[in-house]
Amino acid sequence: MQVTSRRRVTHLTAGQAIARPETLVVEEPLEIRVGGAAVTVTMRTPGSDFELAQGFLLTEGIIGAREDVHSIRYCAGCGEDGANSYNVLDVTLAAGLGRPELDVTRNFYTTSSCGVCGKASLEAVRSVSRFSPAADPATVAAATLQAMPHQLRSAQKVFDSTGGLHAAALFRADGTMLVVREDVGRHNAVDKVIGWALEQQRLPLRATVLLVSGRASFELAQKTVMAGIPVLAAVSAPSSLAVSLAEESGVTLVAFLREDSMNIYTRADRIG
């Protein structure tokens, strides 16, 4: 599966028009099915799709561990020509786990513009979260945290050629980078990271930091809580609802993270 494509563009500069090739990030739909029933469709950059699906199902409260997934496969014959498009995959849950109700799964938040009531959102997250970040005693040195954006940026290989991808990375509290994923959607990048952790049987993600390349929205805070991550850091701004959820859930929320500064919105006791 390709993550980039090439296209000729007309570049205007200093009054001159120059035709040249440009690299674009690929964006394609991914339909996630559970037991043959469609649960969601997300626009994503192809790659790490199984991680994406498992991270999504974990953060939706549908699964809680790798053992909850019996198998994952791409659905053959979904392309217009009958070929495998690799844009539809089906997750078979382990025996004893029922297929999720579609109206329940649709109560969750795959975009930041769904208009869900804030109070209802907070209550929904509390009711399905299997892990409690609040009790995590982990601490992170401020200097360690401030070094993370550079590590993340250095690992963004596709961004270098396209300039069009979000990224998420998981770090140990000592600053060791565990994994980084890029995607056209920031929530997809986070789901891929969490799906990787689930496959590695690392959940709950105690003593870790989730760093995102953009802003900290409610949906990213929700995914942080669902994975048991104690620290969420962002290079850009947080939303008010993200701060509220972090405060209620005991997550340390850091934003505007720079090499020499940061804003700590909740649980500042974890930052030394």
UniProtKB/Swiss-Prot annotation:
GO terms for cellular component: cytoplasm. It is found in: Cytoplasm. The active site is at 114 (cysteine persulfide intermediate). Keywords: Cytoplasm, Molybdenum cofactor biosynthesis. InterPro entries: Cytidine_deaminase-like (IPR016193), FdhD (IPR003786). GO terms for molecular function: sulfur carrier activity; sulfurtransferase activity. The keyword Transport does not apply. SUPFAM superfamilies: Cytidine deaminase-like. Pfam families: FdhD-NarQ. Gene3D superfamilies: 3.10.20.10, Cytidine Deaminase, domain 2. Belongs to the FdhD family. NCBIfam families: fdhD_narQ, PRK00724.1-2. This is Sulfur carrier protein FdhD. It comes from Mycolicibacterium paratuberculosis (strain ATCC BAA-968 / K-10). The gene is fdhD.
